[in-house]
């Protein structure tokens, strides 16, 4: 049992309880979220979040020199500790033809961390004072960097890191497990006597986190207009990074999202008809997923096979999934080994139907997968191998559709006809998937309670199961 870097950073965010505080998902990215580093976001869904991607540049690198930089405030070190331990013990009686006896088993797991973090931040008051005195925060360099142009053409919003929580000293996250089996038997027929034995195994895993690694961060949106750059201080202000940019030159992904957003969000119902807002109406999630399924179905069988067969082995390594997302979001089809490399090879071929954005489809799947935990990804891999995706999708749909619009807890009962095809191991795997989304599931009970916190991961799971089932049917 091991606490991963992802789990540590998420746990730290919960402990700090800071508004708009976000965890860093991968240890390899822990040095890419420094103050003033620029992030971009390329969401593929209206219903689940995408991760922030570092573009590899700092705000200080795209602005003209000699502008005043607000002084950073550093907090006092904050010690954070979390230790968990679990122990199971069982005794088993054995009755056989030639022997009677018993066996005992003990299984112990423990994991945790003991770290110290400090905050480096620029208060909003300092940023606001600077912008009030000087207008926009700074002028862009005359030679605009290529990533700024690419984001402008794709209408991607850019953000700047304004606060980080970093580790103050080298730390090791440790997890250990041990199994102890022992038994004794009386041999009663062929040989008179007693036999006994014992078997032990201990495993220890270590994850070093170096001093300076960033566990969590806060960000603010950038607004770039008339060759100047400003930081949007209010999260409620509705403004894009590149205001006034029209649709010319938009990527196919952006065009797809624009069509989806325009047709769903800007739709005005006829007079006298009341309709739910997009985020409260399940039919809009269903339309979004249906659109992705239709596009996947238009791909050749060979391309669909490549995507499905190479996604499966990647589910055991969320770091690889995250690295692939970063590469695709930055439009850098570089080198990766293994299954991720084969998917990149398929993208380089550009052999899919011209009007289908294969990269956008893969990003949609990857972003949905990253909403799930590592445990859920393992369970999903087992579901793919057992070919129970269709049954799971219908079960998830039966939960989402009637409860999607409710912000409060509502008891519900899973439909017996949907549970029937998921007997034994398949049902156990499905229940664990649902528990990972935030639903309270009991092994021998179809009853549960709707929780608003489960809405986003369930929406992501619904999209994943629908798209993967389409790939299975190819």
UniProtKB/Swiss-Prot annotation:
InterPro entries: Gasdermin, Gasdermin_pore, Gasdermin_PUB. The keyword DNA repair does not apply. It comes from the Eukaryota. GO terms for biological process: defense response to bacterium; programmed cell death; pyroptotic inflammatory response. GO terms for cellular component: cytoplasm; cytosol; plasma membrane. Keywords: Cell membrane, Cytoplasm, Lipoprotein, Membrane, Necrosis, Palmitate, Transmembrane, Transmembrane beta strand. The keyword Lipoprotein applies. Residues 1-237 are annotated as: Triggers pyroptosis. Disulfide bonds: none annotated. Cleavage by CASP8 relieves autoinhibition by releasing the N-terminal moiety (Gasdermin-C, N-terminal) that initiates pyroptosis. One of its GO terms (molecular function) is phosphatidylinositol-4,5-bisphosphate binding. PANTHER family: GASDERMIN, GASDERMIN-C. Belongs to the gasdermin family. Intramolecular interactions between N- and C-terminal domains are important for autoinhibition in the absence of activation signal. The intrinsic pyroptosis-inducing activity is carried by the N-terminal domain. This is Gasdermin-C. It comes from Rattus norvegicus (Rat).
């Amino acid at each position: 049992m091991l606490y991963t870097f992802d789990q540590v950073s998420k746990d730290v965010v919960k402990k700090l309880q800071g508004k708009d505080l976000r965890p860093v998902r991968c240890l390899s990215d822990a040095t890419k979220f420094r103050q003033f580093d620029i992030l971009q976001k390329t969401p593929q869904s209206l219903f689940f979040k995408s991760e922030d991607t570092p573009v590899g540049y700092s705000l200080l690198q795209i602005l003209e020199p000699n502008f005043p930089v607000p002084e950073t405030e550093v907090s006092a070190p904050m010690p954070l500790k979390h230790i968990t331990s679990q122990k199971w013990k069982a005794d088993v009686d054995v009755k056989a033809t030639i022997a009677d006896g018993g066996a005992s088993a003990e299984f112990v797991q423990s994991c945790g961390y003991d770290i110290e973090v400090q905050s480096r931040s620029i208060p909003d008051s300092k940023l606001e004072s600077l912008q009030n005195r000087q207008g926009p925060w700074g002028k862009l360099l005359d030679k605009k960097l290529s990533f700024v142009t690419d984001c402008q053409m794709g209408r991607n919003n850019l953000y700047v890191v304004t606060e980080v929580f970093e580790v103050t000293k080298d730390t090791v996250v440790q997890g250990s497990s041990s199994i102890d089996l022992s038994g004794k038997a009386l041999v009663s027929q062929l040989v008179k006597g007693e036999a006994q034995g014992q078997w032990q195994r201990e495993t220890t895993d270590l994850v070093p986190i170096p001093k300076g690694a960033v566990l969590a961060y806060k960000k603010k949106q950038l607004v770039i207009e008339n060759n100047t750059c400003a930081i949007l201080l209010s999260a409620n202000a509705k403004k894009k990074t590149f205001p006034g940019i029209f649709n010319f030159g938009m990527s196919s992904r952006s065009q797809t999202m624009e069509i989806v957003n325009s047709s769903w969000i800007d739709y005005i119902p006829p007079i006298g008809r009341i309709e739910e807002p997009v985020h409260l109406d399940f039919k809009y999630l269903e339309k979004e997923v249906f659109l992705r399924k239709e596009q996947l179905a238009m791909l050749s069988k060979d391309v669909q096979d490549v995507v499905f067969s190479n996604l499966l082995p990647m589910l055991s390594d969320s770091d690889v999934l995250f690295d692939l997302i970063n590469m695709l979001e930055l439009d850098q089809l570089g080198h990766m080994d293994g299954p991720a490399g084969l998917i990149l090879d398929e993208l380089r071929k550009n052999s899919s139907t011209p009007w289908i954005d294969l990269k956008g489809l893969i990003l949609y799947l990857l972003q949905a997968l990253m909403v799930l935990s590592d445990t859920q990804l393992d369970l999903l891999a087992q579901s793919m191998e057992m070919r129970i995706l269709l049954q799971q999708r219908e079960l998830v749909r039966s939960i989402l559709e009637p409860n999607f619009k409710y912000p409060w807890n509502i008891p519900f009962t899973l439909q017996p006809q949907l549970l029937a095809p998921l007997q034994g191991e398949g049902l156990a795997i499905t229940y664990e998937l649902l528990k990972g989304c935030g639903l309270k599931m009991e092994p021998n009970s179809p009853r549960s309670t709707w929780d608003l916190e489960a809405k986003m991961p369930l929406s992501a799971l619904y999209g994943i199961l629908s798209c993967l089932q389409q790939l299975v049917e190819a």
